[in-house]
């Protein structure tokens, strides 16, 4: 039986709980060392093409296309192992797991992420986040379009959405209104992009890093209004 909660906390993964910019930097270093700068650049060109087509980052799908251009290079066959066996747990932000534990005293914490059906679940599992969230994991293509499904699995009177992308936070705020409190950890390249910061409305709560969520009292998530900064 599904329980109606007073409050549910929804967490993004990449650059919210886990330093995905560092993962990409490590991948770029591996590609440059293994294949050279030119082919490294080509991988990321394909990556962006695939992202535009699908609407999410697809590292393994990019690898499939990269392989077609390097069919006779057996080193390509090792790339999937590098990706799938990457030590994602080493990239969890300091204080992230404590922050998740902190908010769970008031309601369940749920991962709400975008991505493919293989690599993104592997990242969540291998990083230890799947266990930290007790298996409460939702991964979509466009999560901001799946709020009805979120409500079906985790019905609540109010939600808190923690994400490094203001576009996502703005879209969810427009859909749920005062039922959601948006939290913006200023981590990763999207959170520092001047154009993005100028284009979208600020979140209800802004954090310099995800660990600061542990400083937030319950009232920060349940009171009307916004504009708070912590600590």
Model-derived features with residue positions:
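Generic enzyme active-site microenvironment
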Residues: 10-12, 112, 161-162
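Asp-based, Mg2+/Mn2+-dependent phosphohydrolase catalytic module
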Residues: 1-5, 126-161, 165-231
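Short, acidic loop-to-helix structural element flanking the phosphoryl-transfer center
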Residues: 60-61, 81-111, 144-148
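Active-site neighborhood of HAD-like aspartate-dependent phosphohydrolases
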Residues: 1-45, 68-69
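Conserved Rossmann-like nucleotide-cofactor binding loop
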Residues: 16, 23, 117-118, 167, ...
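A metal-dependent, Asp-based hydrolase signature
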Residues: 23, 34-38, 47-84, 102
